[in-house]
């Protein structure tokens, strides 16, 4: 196994770098220190940083395929074994205030028994808990343990986001029950978020399951067992996503039905008004022809009587429609 010295990482300009102390804590990387399975190195990079990118391209610690992946070419969740190390790509929730959570962050890891090199561009908030545990002395002790803690934090964030989406879905369903039409934009955004999450979390669950089943030397049986539990948990969350997607389709159908009913009611009302005023329109048109003079023109009460006649006709037609249960 290749000896990895702390000095080989000094030019990386990492977001943060540390060495596990083997007891759940962390220490700064000593330039003369050596990475071991008991006290491995962890270096976290922003691959858009020119110095970090240059280090990734120039270092001898990584295979060429891993360099390209860590530098931003790997997008979908997947796992790739290279010698004694493994390249893993994850997707996690974007909790940055200025961006939407469904704009998932890509998080890439190269890991073996001695070293973890992770990279991203946008901030991975899931790392904060993992880093905090290490700072408090209750974190990972090995690289395999670190990976399990990492995917556990990612899955927790995914689960919390799914709960938020589920709450939004319930609000839309309550609006439908109250005969209020939700905005199309809100439903479209919710459905898009559900579909995007489903698209990337399904292969991510497969990655977790593969990590749990493969005999990776740097993962203990306990690590594999916990990884399988996390994979199962993500699978249940995917089932919830499928149910939510189906419910958005039902809500869309209900909105279409409610809008059609509203349009039909308006059309029906206009038709009834036309039926009520059609006889009066006919009579006023007939009396206004003026071919032989307007009937009753010479009688001073003629106009009043004609208006009463029209009013009575309107009442009669309205009564007839009511009796016929059209109103």
Curated annotation (Swiss-Prot):
Major subcellular site: membrane
Keyword field: Cell inner membrane, Cell membrane, Ion transport, Membrane, Transmembrane, Transmembrane helix, Transport, Zinc
GO terms, molecular function: cobalt ion binding; cobalt ion transmembrane transporter activity; magnesium ion binding; magnesium ion transmembrane transporter activity; zinc ion transmembrane transporter activity
UniProt subcellular location: Cell inner membrane
Membrane spanning residue stretches: 272-292, 301-321
Record-linked InterPro entries: CorA_cytoplasmic_dom, CorA_TM1_TM2, MgTranspt_CorA/ZnTranspt_ZntB, Zn_transp_ZntB
GO annotations of cellular component type: plasma membrane
All ranges on the Cytoplasmic side of the membrane: 1-271, 322-327
Catalysed reactions, semicolon-separated: Zn(2+)(out) + H(+)(out) = Zn(2+)(in) + H(+)(in)
HAMAP family linked: ZntB (MF_01565)
Function: Zinc transporter. Acts as a Zn(2+):proton symporter, which likely mediates zinc ion uptake.
Name of the protein: Zinc transport protein ZntB
Organism of origin: Photorhabdus laumondii subsp. laumondii (strain DSM 15139 / CIP 105565 / TT01) (Photorhabdus luminescens subsp. laumondii)
Lineage of producing organism: Bacteria, Pseudomonadati, Pseudomonadota, Gammaproteobacteria, Enterobacterales
